[in-house]
Amino acid sequence: MGRAGFVAGNWKMHGSLVRNQELLDAVVSGTRSLQNVSCVVCVPYPYIAQTQSVLEGSHVLWGGQNVSQYHHGAYTGEVSADMLADLGCRYVIVGHSERRTLFGEGNQVVAEKFRAAQERSITPILCVGETLAQRESDETEQVIAMQLDAVIDLAGIEALGQSVIAYEPVWAIGTGKTATPQQAQDVHKFIRSRIAVHSGGIAENIQILYGGSVKADNARELFTMPDIDGGLIGGASLVAAEFISICLAAQN
């Protein structure tokens, strides 16, 4: 049996109490028929409690967009994995390209956040990917290998096997350039082969998502690629009809 589908919505810094309620209600209603696909929404910290109250008992799961590498202490403004767990979060995004680029999170910090989440039974969605400059210098595989190796070195290959990976082609986000389904597949295949160096079983079973501007009109073509198991969805996750269509596309 093949890997199950997985679609995670990343709301980024968007939302309001009124809009959230409408969006979440629509997503729950519109994805009731989903089979063999996990549907997750990763929302801003202040809205996690609201999201929990709306989604609890439904088939839609929720998570955070970031987590501290520390479990408690004098870290003003940080949110720990314990706090996310208190609010029922099953997943958290770590290493998103915006965190790496805008907030200077390097591979070691990302690995520590990955480990902190797992220590509180939260599944990390580990983001990896290369910039335009790195791609044009033919460094894609080297960059992604380093991002994966940092986690494997700190937490171990078995821990990586208990996560979800998302490939973000940073070079294709907001640059006017587009990654074709085949380009995405090529990198997903490399990620799987890199993991297979440590464990063939984990490489075969781990879910790898594509995070490069997935929309309703390109989701099905992307998800038919053999090593693409779903998507990490940005802007389209804020539009109920778009997000629902993407989730349904992941069934195939």
UniProtKB/Swiss-Prot annotation:
Name of protein: Triosephosphate isomerase
Task of the protein: Involved in the gluconeogenesis. Catalyzes stereospecifically the conversion of dihydroxyacetone phosphate (DHAP) to D-glyceraldehyde-3-phosphate (G3P).
Statement: the UniProt record of this protein carries the keyword Cell membrane: no
Major localisation: cytoplasm
Family: Belongs to the triosephosphate isomerase family.
Subcellular location per the Swiss-Prot or TrEMBL entry: Cytoplasm
Annotated transmembrane regions: none
Taxonomic source organism: Nitrosomonas europaea (strain ATCC 19718 / CIP 103999 / KCTC 2705 / NBRC 14298)
Residues that, per the record, bind substrate: 10-12, 174, 213, 234-235
Pathway as given in its UniProt record: Carbohydrate biosynthesis; gluconeogenesis; Carbohydrate degradation; glycolysis; D-glyceraldehyde 3-phosphate from glycerone phosphate: step 1/1
GO CC list: cytosol
Complex formation: Homodimer.
Keyword Nuclease set for record: no
Pfam families referenced in this protein's UniProt entry, alphabetically: TIM (PF00121)
Catalytic residues (UniProt): 96 (electrophile), 168 (proton acceptor)
Protein EC: 5.3.1.1
